[in-house]
A protein has these predicted regions:
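Flexible, glycine-rich surface segments
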Residues: 64-109, 115
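Solvent-exposed, acidic/flexible segments
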Residues: 8-15, 28-32, 36, 70-74, ...
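Active-site-proximal beta-strand/loop segments in catalytic clefts of secreted hydrolases
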Residues: 8-10, 60-63, 92-93, 116-118, ...
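Extracytoplasmic/secreted envelope proteins and their assembly/folding machinery
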Residues: 1, 12, 16-23, 36, ...
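Loop/turn elements at helix/coil->beta-strand transitions in domains of secreted/extracellular proteins
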Residues: 53-56, 109-112, 146-149
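Short, small-residue-biased leader/transition segments that mark boundaries at the very start
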Residues: 2-7
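Structured C-terminal subdomain patch of bacterial secreted/periplasmic proteins
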Residues: 13-27, 115-179
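Basic- and aromatic-lined ligand-binding clefts that recognize polyanionic substrates
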Residues: 31-84
Length: 179
């Protein structure tokens, strides 16, 4: 849409900027407070509970035809994980962004693995990741897998955009990371 071309909303700061402009245009500054400032305060409170823990994470977006690691920049979940103090293994191994291999994942051995789907066919998207990664015996050697820290996340919150649910999205991730 035209609005999405003008307003990038990959992270909460960009969402706040868009909300600021839209509520100025509409004259509904009360909505900026409710949906912007109040949510920003909620997110800041969540971030303040994270302490000095900086877990290594892998964030994967899977679709029917592809499985891609995503870095901290340019994806909703990647940016949130970074905000929460995580170290994304794809940030230090850029080859993962182009060619995700189980060998590189095993070498980095992340503490957590997060997956979100893309597209309408969630079943086909999960089949893609199973074929590439999870069906391989080496997958089960990963610390995150052994410790039950492999999570499939809601694409509406972590791939598309959480919009009014930014606070919820941050809280769910923080709760997982504090387990």
């Amino acid at each position: 849409s035209a609005a999405s071309d003008v307003y990038k909303r990959q992270n909460f700061a960009q969402y706040l900027n868009m909300l600021d402009h839209c509520t100025m245009i509409t004259g509904r500054r009360d909505l900026y407070k409710t949906n912007g400032e109040d949510v920003n305060q909620q997110i800041d409170e969540i971030k303040s509970t994270m302490g000095n823990n900086h877990p290594k994470v892998l964030f994967i977006r899977t679709a029917a035809s592809s499985v891609k690691a995503k870095g901290s920049a340019g994806s909703v979940c990647g940016e949130m994980l970074s905000d929460l103090g995580c170290v994304n293994i794809a940030d230090s191994d850029k080859s993962m962004l182009d060619d995700l291999s189980l060998e590189s994942i095993v070498a980095a051995d992340p503490d957590y693995i997060f997956v979100t789907t893309q597209g309408n066919d969630t079943q086909a998207a999960m089949k893609s990741i199973n074929n590439l990664l999870t069906d391989n015996a080496a997958w089960n050697s990963l610390r995150a897998v052994k410790e039950g820290k492999y999570y499939v996340l809601d694409k509406k919150l972590y791939n598309i955009k959480p919009n009014a649910r930014w606070g919820t999205a941050y809280k769910q991730l923080a709760d997982i990371l504090k387990q």
